[in-house]
Amino acid sequence: MKKVLTLTALSTLLLSTSAMAAGFHLREQSAAAQGNAFAGATAGAENGSYAYYNAAGLTRQKGLQVNLGATYIAPRATAKNVMSENGTRGADVENVVHAAVSPNGTVSYQLNDRAFAAIAVNSPFGMITKYDRDWIGSDHGITSDLKSGTITPMFAYKATDKLSLGAGVQMQYVWAHLTSSHNYSRTGLVTENGNDFDMGYQLGAMYEFSDATRVGVGYRSKIDHKLKGKMKSSGSALITSDNPDYAGAGMQANALMNQKISAKLTTPAMLSMGVYHDINEKWAVMAEYQRVFWSSFQNLTFVGDRLNKPTGNIAQVKENWRDTNFYSIGTSYMLDNQWKLRLGLAYDQSAVRYAHRTPRIPDSDRIWYSMGLGYQYNENLSFDMGYTYIKAHSAKMNSAVTKNEGSHVSADYSNSVKVFAFSVNYAF
């Protein structure tokens, strides 16, 4: 009997994230930057929403300004050629990843000629996935729902006429809801819920070579979460006295699986560098590089409080994620005094290599194609719209290669996503 119960819990949060962004990061925090595929996001500072990428850019926001936005993420993920470990062919799975809305907002205020403050609200990590209850890989996950909310007070200071510095405190809440079937017989349902609050920081710098050219560097720290919650099980009893890994004779599944649980989840550190240049009064070009330190996510250990094992581990999944690179280039063009056109192209590297790709994380590299519009309604009020089509490379997955516990399942994944972003900015 396999000793793992299918409680690879938080791994199923990451199911089919290849259709959205590398890992489970939601890069989409600015409608204006969306139009340029986030090229120059750490140097652009067109409005307060750019402070998510670099707090130092606040020194370009004069007076009191409010930016409110939302991003609608509409992914499409399909699993084909689904096979079980005994060679049984499963049905293709359509629309695994569900659409979601990621809100964002920033209020910035100029304290004096050199000091600036702001508070930002973002949802930087999250996703929703749902498989059919009877799909072949149901023990690897059925429903996965991850939500996050981050409030970041920020401060920026114009150290010289050319150099600006910024910093912020990330206060982050994470909530997760997951379901899967028992991996012994795939009868019954396991439900896990957990949440946590923890803190991190962000740092930034911006240097303006001239009125036309500037560069920026931004860093967001990792945040180590320990999600705590409950696990509940419904269905037939599956644990018997001949299983030495669990508590003594006669222990039943419901007795073992209705318990308190915890799991560690780290949201990764990110380092970004960007450049922005005005070629003339109408035309600007920009570029961005971002390093996401996903290597902090090597193993996922899920701990329960009713095991007779020394560690209390219900399951340990080897993730072995790698650090990733994101590259983007973009351009903007003023069509007239009110309308601005934005274009961008990006390459987004996957955190998961083939040897570690699982049904929970069929991630792959992707290309971003972006465009957007900015509209200056009057001196105080402006609007931004962004659209991105993301095409992920095809991803072959065979869980037997990963050597993790649980049933074996293989599939070919095809993923894409459409992203629509809108924001309004008002300067008082």
Predicted regions and their residues:
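Glycine-rich loop at the start of a catalytic domain that most often binds anionic cofactors/ligands
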Residues: 63, 81-86
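Hydrophobic alpha-helical membrane context
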Residues: 14-15, 66, 396
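Outer-membrane beta-barrel pore proteins
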Residues: 41-46, 51-64, 107-111
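A general structural signal for short secondary-structure junctions and capping/turn motifs
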Residues: 12-14, 58, 107, 208
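Transmembrane beta-strand segments of Gram-negative outer membrane beta-barrel proteins
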Residues: 24-40, 59-78
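A common structural microfeature
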Residues: 33, 48-49, 63-74, 102-104, ...
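Gram-negative bacterial Sec-dependent N-terminal signal peptides
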Residues: 1-21
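Outer-membrane beta-barrel porins/channels
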Residues: 22-37, 41, 84-92, 99-428
